[in-house]
Amino acid sequence: MNPLAQPVIYSTIFAGTLITALSSHWFFTWVGLEMNMLAFIPVLTKKMNPRSTEAAIKYFLTQATASMILLMAILFNNMLSGQWTMTNTTNQYSSLMIMMAMAMKLGMAPFHFWVPEVTQGTPLTSGLLLLTWQKLAPISIMYQISPSLNVSLLLTLSILSIMAGSWGGLNQTQLRKILAYSSITHMGWMMAVLPYNPNMTILNLTIYIILTTTAFLLLNLNSSTTTLLLSRTWNKLTWLTPLIPSTLLSLGGLPPLTGFLPKWAIIEEFTKNNSLIIPTIMATITLLNLYFYLRLIYSTSITLLPMSNNVKMKWQFEHTKPTPFLPTLIALTTLLLPISPFMLMIL
């Protein structure tokens, strides 16, 4: 990517997300989504090769299809109600079409097939933006129209997403695909609680972004893209050996780490609404995520690649990449649970 074009591209992505998140008019919301989508394609093709080009085409086709469905739903709602305001989305069919479009943009099941492929075909930094920043605009739309959502359909999509994300990651060896399937599972949890408590979705999204950002930065620091390459962590960067497992366990939602907080709060929210079966199913299926996280932890902390003695301590002399935000992110990833009563009180 041309260095001169980078500020324009990233500022357009930021502006598109901001327009969508702050707008209450359907037309400007759609324009913001389109700005965001078109500006993000060069980010996916940062390294020009056939795999990244294929990933960009898959991303464009999926997002363009979702945008067409969204535009059709907006026009249909305007024909029936004469309103462009997002809070006046009262027509049932328009609401269903908007939900389908946002499910495609978020990568929820059964529209999730593009997420692992696109994430795998891009560099780690582009994959990080795809799985974090690109979720903000669709979730802001879902947040604004949450009173008019079809609860049964949304819960069905959420459970399907949790199932697809948990089972899809079981036989993977590529770290980017594993994190993509983890993202699908987290999307299921976020959308499940949206009709009951939209603010809980925002809390879940915030913690998800912190955890995923930490995981991607650690893997990028280690230059690891497969489970086999994780085995060289001890020889290459020994100080990462305890950090990667703790981050992965937090992503899996294991107490007493930060990742347990959103799951605990969501299960409590369902219990308050006298719904016990759905959170039980969600929590049980999500346990499969812990299995493939434990596989990664095994590769990181227990398995060692065969290396000669003269390079075993090479990490002491390597010039590591600057990581100004990593200590703060690691602290938030592991130590946020004790202040959870304060956070839940705000909600």
From Swiss-Prot:
Record flagged with keyword tRNA-binding: no
Subcellular location: Mitochondrion inner membrane
The enzyme's E.C. designation: 7.1.1.2
This protein's UniProt keywords: Alzheimer disease, Amyloidosis, Disease variant, Electron transport, Leber hereditary optic neuropathy, Leigh syndrome, Membrane, Mitochondrion, Mitochondrion inner membrane, NAD, Neurodegeneration, Primary mitochondrial disease, Respiratory chain, Translocase, Transmembrane, Transmembrane helix, Transport, Ubiquinone
GO annotation, cellular component aspect: mitochondrial inner membrane; mitochondrion; respiratory chain complex I
Assigned protein family: Belongs to the complex I subunit 2 family.
Subunit structure: Core subunit of respiratory chain NADH dehydrogenase (Complex I) which is composed of 45 different subunits. Interacts with TMEM242.
Disease linked to the protein: Leber hereditary optic neuropathy: A maternally inherited form of Leber hereditary optic neuropathy, a mitochondrial disease resulting in bilateral painless loss of central vision due to selective degeneration of the retinal ganglion cells and their axons. The disorder shows incomplete penetrance and male predominance. Cardiac conduction defects and neurological defects have also been described in some LHON patients. LHON results from primary mitochondrial DNA mutations affecting the respiratory chain complexes.
Protein name: NADH-ubiquinone oxidoreductase chain 2
Organism expressing this protein natively: Homo sapiens (Human)
